[in-house]
C-alpha cells in the first residue's frame, strides 16, 4: 500500500502534485507496523495536507527568531529539507505587516517535514537542548492542521471538521503560544490559537479563538476550561455563533479568498474580529447573523452600576497628559470600534471616549490599559453613561428637595397668655374677685397705706421678701406708719422704732405660710 503525498509550495500559493519532488513519500506496508507512522496512516483514504502527520508544532521560540534561524536549528539536527511557517505579530488583513512595533514572532511556528517518518523522528527530540542556544529546549508536538499560505492564514478545510470556541478575559501579556499550549496539553485536536490584536498598536484586545478538529473535544473544552487561570486571570470560553464558521485570518480575521470577494460585508464588523468567516454559500447567513457573533456563558450578574451596566459604553481615561488633544485621543482609540464622542475636560488630566457598543469599550480598556500617550501611561476604567449621569443628577435633586422639606421654618414664640402692655399701670386686687384668692383662704384683706386725698391709691408698689432689707428700704414703703393698720401682723412681726417700722420678714413669712397666705406682707 503506497500513497503519493500532496506537496505545498508557498511561493506558488496553490497545491500541486509533484511525483519527482523531494517531498514525495512512499509508505510501504512494512511501515504500517511502525509506531512512528500511526498518525500518518489514520484516515488514509482522505490523505491531504495537514493530516498526513508530517507537520510539527514548534513552540517556545525566541521572539527574534525568523525562518532562517529555525532552518539552521533543524539543519544542525540533521533535518535540512524542511519548510517553516512562522507566525508573526502585527500582520494586517492584506497580509502585510504593520509599521508599528518590532518584527517579532508569536512564539511558535509550524515545521513541515518530507514525510511522517521524518516528523516522528524529529518529535523524539522534544525537550532536547537546541544547538548554539544553550538556554533553549525544543518544544515539539503534532500539528493537526496546516495553513494555506505563508501569510499566516488558515487553510480552507471542510467546515464539518473544524470547531472553534471564543476565549475572553485574556490578560494583556498572554501570547498565542501560551493560549495554544494551554489547550493542546489537554485536547490533542487543538489545531490553532488566535488572539485578536489591534492593527495600529499591535496590543492584544483581550480575546481570541481556539480551533479544534474534533467536535467532542471542543464541547469538553467549553465545559472544562471555563474559569481556568492563564497568566493570573480566569478566562471565559463560549461557542461561536455557528460551528461551521472558522478563523480565516491572523489579525481581526481576514476575508476568505473567494467567499468575501463578491460580498459587501460591513468593514466595521470585520475590523473587530467578532466572528469566524463562512465558506461556500453561507455568505448570506453570515451577513444576517453578524449582529450576534458570540454566545457568552450565562452568569449571575451583580447589581447594575456604571461598571456592570451592559449599556454603558463610556471609557474613562485617567493620567492623561495636558498636551493631548481630543483628535489625538480619538486616533488612539479609533481602532477598537466606532466612537460616538471624545471629551477632554479642561484642566482635569483625564478624558472620556464613548463607543457605539460595549464590546468595543471592553476591547479598548483591555488593549490600552497602561499604554503610553504623550509620555504618560494612561489608566482606563468605566465611565458613567449618559443615562447613569441623568439618574444621578435626578437623585441628587430629589434628595435636596426632601431635606429642605424636612427642615422646620422659623416660628414666632407662642405664649399661653396675652402679656400686658408695659404702659399700663398694675391694678390693685379686688377683694370681691374670687379668682384672686389663694387655695385655703376665704377672704384676703388688702390695705392701702398710700391712699391720698382723693381716695385713690398710689400705684407705685414694691414687694420685698429679702431678709437683708435695710430699715431705710422698709421705711420707704410706709408713707405714714402712724396711720397703718397693723392689727393683722401680730404685733411681734413689726417693730416700731420712732418713725421707722422694721418688718421681721423671716418670721412673718413663716407665719403667713402656715396660715395659708402668700408669704408676703402687703402694706
From Swiss-Prot:
Q: Where is this region: Disordered?
A: 1-35, 239-260
Name the Gene Ontology biological process terms: mRNA 5'-splice site recognition; mRNA splice site recognition; mRNA splicing, via spliceosome; positive regulation of mRNA splicing, via spliceosome
InterPro entries in the record, alphabetically? Answer: Nucleotide-bd_a/b_plait_sf (IPR012677), RBD_domain_sf (IPR035979), RBM42_RBP45_47-like (IPR050825), RRM_dom (IPR000504)
Q: Keywords in UniProt for this one?
A: mRNA processing, mRNA splicing, Repeat, RNA-binding, Spliceosome
A Pfam short name: RRM_1
Quaternary assembly: Component of the U1 small nuclear ribonucleoprotein complex (U1 snRNP).
Q: Which PANTHER family match?
A: TRNA SELENOCYSTEINE 1-ASSOCIATED PROTEIN 1-RELATED (PTHR47640:SF10), TRNA SELENOCYSTEINE 1-ASSOCIATED PROTEIN 1-RELATED-RELATED (PTHR47640)
Task: From the Swiss-Prot or TrEMBL record, give the protein name.
Answer: Protein NAM8
Amino acid at each position: 500500500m503506497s500513497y503519493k503525498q500532496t506537496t505545498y509550495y508557498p511561493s506558488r500559493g496553490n497545491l500541486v502534485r509533484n511525483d519527482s519532488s523531494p517531498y514525495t513519500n512512499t509508505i510501504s506496508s512494512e511501515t504500517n507496523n511502525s509506531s512512528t507512522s500511526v498518525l500518518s496512516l489514520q484516515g488514509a483514504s482522505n490523505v491531504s495536507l495537514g493530516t498526513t502527520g508530517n507537520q510539527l508544532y514548534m513552540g517556545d521560540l525566541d521572539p527574534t527568531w525568523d525562518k532562517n534561524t529555525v532552518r539552521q536549528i533543524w539543519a544542525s539536527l540533521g533535518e535540512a529539507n524542511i519548510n517553516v511557517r512562522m507566525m508573526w505579530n502585527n500582520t494586517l488583513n492584506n497580509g502585510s505587516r504593520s509599521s508599528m512595533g518590532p518584527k517579532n514572532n508569536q512564539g511558535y511556528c509550524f515545521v513541515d517535514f518530507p514525510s511522517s517518518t521524518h516528523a516522528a523522528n524529529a518529535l523524539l527530540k522534544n525537550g532536547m537542548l537546541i544547538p548554539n542556544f544553550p538556554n533553549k529546549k525544543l518544544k515539539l508536538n503534532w500539528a493537526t492542521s496546516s495553513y494555506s499560505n505563508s501569510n499566516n492564514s488558515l487553510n480552507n478545510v471542510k467546515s464539518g471538521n473544524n470547531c472553534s470556541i471564543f476565549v475572553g478575559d485574556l490578560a494583556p501579556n498572554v501570547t498565542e503560544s501560551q493560549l495554544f499550549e494551554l489547550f493542546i496539553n489537554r485536547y490533542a485536536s487543538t489545531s490553532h490559537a488566535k488572539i485578536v490584536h489591534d492593527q495600529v498598536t499591535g496590543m492584544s484586545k483581550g480575546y481570541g479563538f481556539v480551533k479544534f478538529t474534533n467536535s467532542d473535544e471542543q464541547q469538553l473544552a467549553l465545559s472544562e476550561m471555563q474559569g481556568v487561570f492563564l497568566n493570573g486571570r480566569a478566562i471565559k470560553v463560549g461557542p461561536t455563533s455557528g460551528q461551521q464558521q472558522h478563523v480565516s485570518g491572523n489579525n481581526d480575521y481576514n476575508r476568505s479568498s473567494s467567499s468575501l470577494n463578491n460580498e459587501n460585508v460591513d468593514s466595521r464588523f470585520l475590523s473587530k474580529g467578532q466572528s469566524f468567516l463562512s465558506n461556500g454559500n453561507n455568505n448570506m447567513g453570515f451577513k444576517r447573523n453578524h449582529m450576534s457573533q458570540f454566545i457568552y456563558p450565562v452568569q449571575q450578574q451583580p447589581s447594575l452600576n456604571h461598571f456592570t451596566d451592559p449599556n454603558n459604553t463610556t471609557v474613562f481615561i485617567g493620567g492623561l497628559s495636558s498636551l493631548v488633544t481630543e483628535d489625538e485621543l480619538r486616533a488612539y482609540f479609533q481602532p477598537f470600534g466606532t466612537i460616538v464622542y471624545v471629551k477632554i475636560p479642561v484642566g482635569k488630566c483625564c478624558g472620556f471616549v464613548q463607543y457605539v457598543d460595549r464590546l468595543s469599550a471592553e476591547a479598548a480598556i483591555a488593549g490600552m490599559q497602561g499604554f503610553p500617550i504623550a509620555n504618560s501611561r494612561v489608566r482606563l476604567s468605566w465611565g458613567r453613561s449618559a443615562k447613569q449621569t441623568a439618574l444621578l443628577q435626578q437623585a441628587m435633586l430629589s434628595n435636596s428637595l426632601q431635606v429642605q422639606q424636612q427642615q422646620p421654618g422659623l416660628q414666632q414664640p407662642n405664649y399661653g397668655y396675652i402679656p400686658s402692655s408695659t404702659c399700663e399701670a398694675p391694678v390693685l386686687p379686688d377683694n370681691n374677685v374670687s379668682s384672686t384668692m389663694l387655695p385655703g383662704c376665704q377672704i384676703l384683706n388688702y390695705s392701702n397705706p398710700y391712699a391720698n386725698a382723693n381716695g385713690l391709691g398710689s400705684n407705685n408698689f414694691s414687694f420685698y421678701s429679702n431678709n437683708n432689707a435695710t430699715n431705710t428700704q422698709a421705711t420707704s414703703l410706709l408713707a405714714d406708719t402712724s396711720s397703718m393698720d397693723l392689727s393683722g401682723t401680730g404685733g411681734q412681726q413689726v417693730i416700731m422704732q420712732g418713725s421707722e417700722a422694721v418688718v421681721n420678714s423671716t418670721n412673718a413669712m413663716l407665719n403667713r405660710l402656715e396660715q395659708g397666705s402668700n408669704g408676703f406682707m402687703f402694706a
